């Protein structure tokens, strides 16, 4: 037991140290491609659009987001799912291409859209109301596809929210 306690304590401290690693809020390059899933947007006009979205789940992945990526394909994006509904506040630091930010409320309904956000801007882009997720898409795609507030977003990551 005398050896077990120090070994257990040392193991706990190593685990705690790994959890306590600071978030690098000033990365210098794009993060590797993250795990993906399919996402469907159903418009109130009856149109359907399919996207493949990356899922940043760790604080570091969420902080880095689309930074330094020089393009976002029209059928791809990034879905930030929050642990609980919150006012989503984003920015375009180190993002060289415009994005459409789609703010998703309860039941997967789109509650706000910020179109063609300004590359590299440090201005806050806010959902204005608590949302369960934020979807980043290629700038201009929501207007081109006539995606609007009130449309439905369906994705496994949003299930049960």
Q: Residues of each region from the PLM?
A:
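Sec-dependent signal peptide recognition
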Residues: 2-9
């Amino acid at each position: 037991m005398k050896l077990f306690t120090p070994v257990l304590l040392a193991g706990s401290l190593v685990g705690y140290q790994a959890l306590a690693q600071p978030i690098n809020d000033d990365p210098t390059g794009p993060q590797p491609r993250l795990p993906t899933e399919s996402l469907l947007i159903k418009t109130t006009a009856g149109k359907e659009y399919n996207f493949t979205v990356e899922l940043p789940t760790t604080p570091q992945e969420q902080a880095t987001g689309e930074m330094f990526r020089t393009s976002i394909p029209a059928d791809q994006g990034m879905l930030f799912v929050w642990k609980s509904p919150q006012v989503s506040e984003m920015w375009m630091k180190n993002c060289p291409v415009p994005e459409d930010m789609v703010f998703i409320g309860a039941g997967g309904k789109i509650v706000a859209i910020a179109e063609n956000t300004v590359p590299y801007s440090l201005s806050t882009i806010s959902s204005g109301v608590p949302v369960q997720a934020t979807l980043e898409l290629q700038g201009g795609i929501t207007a081109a596809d006539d995606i609007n507030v009130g449309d439905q977003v369906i994705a496994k990551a949003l299930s049960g929210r």
